[in-house]
């Protein structure tokens, strides 16, 4: 049987009509799934019993199994631990802002990148998520909380561009007006920098936002923080960003986790401003969050000095206010909390 959440709109219409159902039945099914959060064909009462029985023979609509939910006492940020059908686990986060709700979703079980300041990488890599598993995080959170998600950031567990096809397909599903109906400009992909995939993304015709997790201005320092940098250098990544901007004209957010004594020197700030010169970027400075790595954030004075250097050199920058750090839901804190099975 096929997972209905793996299917694009056109694929679903094709599947439905091949079973002898009218085309408009696809819209009825999607209304039940995406609007009403119903994943049981028996509850789809505007379909005949015969049609429901037929659909059950061919499709499943698996929402995720909730294992644990933690709510921040500081800001209401909510973290969900989900179990997948094969017993593996992932985490997703719902973040509340005035007038909007943002979901932070995962694209892989674990992560192959292994950033030294990130808890996810410490768990190792198990497998890519399917398109349906990515989409189901949104539906499962909305069903659990009874609230509509308006913004999505692909900043959870995993590197989205190393699960490229499923990530892109999930974005198209979440954006489709008869499916997720989330505005394309309200969707952000965060990447450590896979040059060929950044350029491929530019050709997709998707008006998503792109965030680059840079974290260091030199290869020497970035090699230590982001091991994948040994394969893709800072220069290669920034060249890909240049091509991306030539093709799309879009500004790119640069994410920079500040770690005391590692990448927070004034010389780091000056070098960062130098390598970003000429690019259309905005820098998010993120004081490192507590993880088992034992790294610590710089002093407030040092963070402000770092930001000031960037501003003085014409680089827009802000200090990101992290949400959910008390429940390990902030940047770099998501991880596998239970034993995982091998692929």
From Swiss-Prot:
Tell whether Magnesium is among the UniProt keywords.
no
Where do the catalytic residues lie?
A: 91, 331
Cofactors required: [4Fe-4S] cluster
According to its UniProt record, where is this protein located? Cytoplasm
Catalysed reactions, semicolon-separated: adenosine(2503) in 23S rRNA + 2 reduced [2Fe-2S]-[ferredoxin] + 2 S-adenosyl-L-methionine = 2-methyladenosine(2503) in 23S rRNA + 5'-deoxyadenosine + L-methionine + 2 oxidized [2Fe-2S]-[ferredoxin] + S-adenosyl-L-homocysteine; adenosine(37) in tRNA + 2 reduced [2Fe-2S]-[ferredoxin] + 2 S-adenosyl-L-methionine = 2-methyladenosine(37) in tRNA + 5'-deoxyadenosine + L-methionine + 2 oxidized [2Fe-2S]-[ferredoxin] + S-adenosyl-L-homocysteine
- List the keywords (alphabetical): 4Fe-4S, Cytoplasm, Disulfide bond, Iron, Iron-sulfur, Metal-binding, Methyltransferase, rRNA processing, S-adenosyl-L-methionine, Transferase, tRNA processing
EC no.?
Answer: 2.1.1.192
Q: Where does S-adenosyl-L-methionine bind?
A: 158-159, 190, 213-215, 289
One GO location term (cellular component): cytoplasm
For the ligand ([4Fe-4S] cluster), the binding residues are 111, 115, 118
Gene3D superfamilies per UniProt: 1.10.150.530, Aldolase class I (3.20.20.70)
Give all residue intervals belonging to the Radical SAM core domain.
Answer: 97-326
Per the entry, the cofactor note is: Binds 1 [4Fe-4S] cluster. The cluster is coordinated with 3 cysteines and an exchangeable S-adenosyl-L-methionine.
Q: What class of enzyme is it?
A: transferase
Primary localization: cytoplasm
A Pfam family matched in the record: Radical_SAM
Matching PANTHER family, A to Z? 23S RRNA METHYLTRANSFERASE (PTHR30544), RADICAL SAM CORE DOMAIN-CONTAINING PROTEIN (PTHR30544:SF5)
The family assignment reads: Belongs to the radical SAM superfamily. RlmN family.
Q: What else is known?
A: Reaction proceeds by a ping-pong mechanism involving intermediate methylation of a conserved cysteine residue.
Q: What is this protein called?
A: Probable dual-specificity RNA methyltransferase RlmN
């Amino acid at each position: 049987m096929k997972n209905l959440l793996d299917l694009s709109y056109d694929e679903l219409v094709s599947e439905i009509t091949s079973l002898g159902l009218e085309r408009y039945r696809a819209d009825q099914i999607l209304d039940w799934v995406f609007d009403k959060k119903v994943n049981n064909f028996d509850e789809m009462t505007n379909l005949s019993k015969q049609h429901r029985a037929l659909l059950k023979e061919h499709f499943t609509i698996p929402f995720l199994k909730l294992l644990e939910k933690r709510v921040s006492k500081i800001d209401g940020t909510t973290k969900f631990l989900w179990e997948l059908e094969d017993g593996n686990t992932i985490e997703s986060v719902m973040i509340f802002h005035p007038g909007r709700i943002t979901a932070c979703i995962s694209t892989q079980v674990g992560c192959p990148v292994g950033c030294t300041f990130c808890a996810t990488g410490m768990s190792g890599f198990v497998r890519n998520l399917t398109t349906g598993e990515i989409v189901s995080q949104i539906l499962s959170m909305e069903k659990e909380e009874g609230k509509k998600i308006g913004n999505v950031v692909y900043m959870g567990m995993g590197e989205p561009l190393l699960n490229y096809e499923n990530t892109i397909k999930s974005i198209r599903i979440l954006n489709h007006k008869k499916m997720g109906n989330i505005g394309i400009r309200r969707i952000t992909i965060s990447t450590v920098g896979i040059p060929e995939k950044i350029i491929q993304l530019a050709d997709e015709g998707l008006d998503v936002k792109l965030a680059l997790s840079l974290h260091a201005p030199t290869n020497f320092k970035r090699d230590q923080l982001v091991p994948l940098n040994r394969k893709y250098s800072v220069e290669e990544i920034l060249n890909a960003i240049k091509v991306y901007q030539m093709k799309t004209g879009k500004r790119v957010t640069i994410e920079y986790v500040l770690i005391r004594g590692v990448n927070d020197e004034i010389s780091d700030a000056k070098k960062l401003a130098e390598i970003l010169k000429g690019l259309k970027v905005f820098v998010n400075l993120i004081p490192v969050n507590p993880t088992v790595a034992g790294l610590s954030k710089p002093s407030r004075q040092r963070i402000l000095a770092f930001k000031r250097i960037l501003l003085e050199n014409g680089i827009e920058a802000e200090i990101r206010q992290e949400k959910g750090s008390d429940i390990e839901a902030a940047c770099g804190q998501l991880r596998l909390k239970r034993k995982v099975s091998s692929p």
